[in-house]
Amino acid sequence: MSTIRLREFVERRPSIPPRLYITHQGRDIKGYYPGQLARLHFDYSGRKAPRPLIDLTIPLKSTTPYQPQLDQQTLIRSICSRRLSRPTDLWHNETSYQRDYSLPFYESGWDRKLGTISLHPRPVNSVPEVYCCGGERSSYARSTF
């Protein structure tokens, strides 16, 4: 019976070994049958530190996916209008878009200006206690100091 060989590592011609000896990766192992040879390579990737986990959680949908762009006067008027009481039957039938853009100060006539100029500029995040809802609760006129 002839011998079965998987790979034969035989150098046919004699040669002088190079100055830098190259080591081959892996090692030779014998097969199940006599004469079988194979090259075994080790996989060291399992011994490395695992990569950091990527956060794959789906972000929760926010209640308002948009925020209306407001200037300072519009912000003050918006805070004032939200402090006023509204009938409860409208709360159930309106969308968030209607809630933010159907405020009374957006309904301007032909004689009203859309842009407002502030005589007393303040930071946007300050609470407009002085300006808001001074004497009349239905008008959005600004109170004086």
Curated annotation (Swiss-Prot):
Pfam families (UniProt xref): DUF5530 (PF17670)
InterPro entries, A to Z: SPMIP3
PANTHER family in UniProt: CHROMOSOME 1 OPEN READING FRAME 100, HYPOTHETICAL PROTEIN LOC689766
Protein name, as recorded: Protein SPMIP3
Native organism: Mus musculus (Mouse)
Gene: SPMIP3
